[in-house]
Amino acid sequence: MSDILNKILAVKADEVAAAKKYRSLASLRSEVEADKDARAALRNFEGALRQKIAAGNAGIIAEIKKASPSKGIIRPDFQPDQIATSYAQHGAACLSVLTDVQFFQGSPDYLKQARAACSLPVLRKDFMIDPYQIYEARSWGADCILLIVAGLDHGLMAELEACAHELGMHVLVEVHNGEELNAALRLKTTLLGVNNRNLRTFETSLQTTLDLLPRIPPEKLVITESAIVTPDDVKKMRDADVHAFLIGETFMRAPDPGQELNRLFS
């Protein structure tokens, strides 16, 4: 596990402990489980991706991200609601919203604002280590959570997945290498993200997705993440029968993120 990932996970553990002191898991869980209207308002994350792909289009998870540990501030003029609206207008299937405060300058409020601005399903993009965070995510309006295999053992991953599924949420499991893929394939979720960024070196290569593809069962929906910068990158993936993408920085650096999405996939 990389030093930066270790550091993030340690901070996450402190954050969750502090949150539980402010509000207990039992209290949060009872509120979420009692809110029938919120459950009825869940948006179908996987369904939105598959619907786009079935129509011959790319299934794009468009990310709303202000900053990152490796790049610093990515988008100084940061208006989550406007970005979400632009993404929806230009054909995104789903949104991914960073909620990590310390390392990515995200916020739960950004997720709420983005979801309120459009009808797209929303992923809480964060480092999930405790069921408490899943109940948080649902209370904020998230429809899907992310599990990063590099930071979790199988028992905890299975527990977190089961918690999300009980709440009607989808789960995107993220891998970077063969060992992580083996662990991910033990889960029930069909959403499999391949991160082309090495979390140890932060180097990126689309070859990561291409190398792992032959080992991924056909029922899994493969989502290639990071390193998609040009239309040629998109073509390379689609020629390999990868039609789902999670893209953040490329869109965030453009004057209009939605128009950049349209340019990249036109």
Swiss-Prot record:
Catalyzed reaction equations: 1-(2-carboxyphenylamino)-1-deoxy-D-ribulose 5-phosphate + H(+) = (1S,2R)-1-C-(indol-3-yl)glycerol 3-phosphate + CO2 + H2O
Keywords: Amino-acid biosynthesis, Aromatic amino acid biosynthesis, Decarboxylase, Lyase, Tryptophan biosynthesis
Gene3D superfamilies attached to this UniProt entry: Aldolase class I
Record pathway: Amino-acid biosynthesis; L-tryptophan biosynthesis; L-tryptophan from chorismate: step 4/5
EC nos: 4.1.1.48
Superkingdom: Bacteria
Alphabetical list of InterPro entries matching this protein: Aldolase_TIM, Indole-3-glycerol_P_synth, Indole-3-glycerol_P_synth_dom, Indole-3-GlycerolPSynthase_CS, RibuloseP-bd_barrel
An example molecular function term from Gene Ontology annotations: phosphoribosylanthranilate isomerase activity
Family of the protein in this entry: Belongs to the TrpC family.
Protein name in UniProt: Indole-3-glycerol phosphate synthase
Organismal lineage: Bacteria, Pseudomonadati, Pseudomonadota, Betaproteobacteria, Burkholderiales
